[in-house]
Amino acid sequence: MLFAQLTHAIGLNDVCDALRLHSGPLSALRGATAPSRNNLSHANKRRDATLAERLFWTVLEHLQKLSPGFATGRQGKGLARRFRRVIHVVDSSTIALIASCIDWAQHRRRKAAAKLHVRLDLHSLLPRFVLVESAKAADSIRAAEVCAGVKPGEIVIFDRAYVDFIHLGVLNGDGVFWVTRSKESLCFRVVKRLPKPTDKRILSDELVVLKNKDSRANYPEAMRRVRALVEIDGKEREMEFLTNNVSWSATSVADLYRCRWQIEVFFKQIKQSLQLCDFLGNSANAVRWQVWTALLLYVLMRFLCVMSSWSHSFTRLFTLLRATLWRKIDLWDLLRFYGIAGGHFRYLATPQSAYLPGFAQ
């Protein structure tokens, strides 16, 4: 399945034929042989996708132990590092499927889709929670499950689709700081207006309580409402943010929510670079297998980025790996010197020969 991701295979025949054509190098992997189409189809349908899920978390844990810098995030800069707290970003993305072939994921009359819920560590850009399911359920139903691993003192940022006042009350009681957008239909009453900062982007800063009887029963405490101008695509838009923290500056609240867009970059990377458009099977199990292997490849590529100080785009790394898939090349040297004038890499062996480290130089 990782091979299918790297080659952007659009069908079972693509995988089987390509592996059969490279049977020589493939046999060097403990005598591996290319699967038949029927065997691959049966495994894709019957083999429990929980195996792929466990493999993903096991590999991620191993890589984090292998390199502490990979776990903590060497890319954490600016706001993420200034807060010196773990910052979680929560969002979901729909993965389009073929409605005529897939009935388990139909969520509209003529559409079918799977939904990927992710809680991302903002410092390391690594997933901390992943849920793959049908797109039928609303995001707010999964809010408590997605945020179950957040610890007291940490920060969680999510879109207004995840707003559930029972869940917000639980987070507040557990000592978790949260930031989200306010729904347009939110009914509230202002109890205190906070001093307005000098930043002209901040339009108002106030403490509010909910007016709706049921909502106030679920969240009786006052919450902070910040109204600010946020630049999106070169234009300033007015947005309203809610948080349970009253000590941060209003500018920090707005900047924190803006960091949530990092998860949009994550979804863009896996959906544009990896194979999440054409699926090798129509069953729920087959779709989950392909999603989990895509996430596994993302983690492996993220590890390569951090350890080799890769300065180019994620897509460029993917195309480079795909081009060198059947070449016995020192990958670290290739990534380290890629794009540098005079940079070089060395072959570990000719493509069709066995690689026996320690026997020959």
Which ranges hold each PLM region?
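Short Lys/Arg-enriched helix C-cap and helix-to-coil transition segments
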Residues: 51-67
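Major-groove recognition helix of helix-turn-helix-like DNA-binding domains
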Residues: 28-47
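Short edge-strand/loop segments of extracellular domains
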Residues: 22
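Single, function-defining residue in the core of a domain
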Residues: 1-14, 18, 47, 54-55, ...
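A short, well-structured juxtamembrane/interface segment
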Residues: 65-76
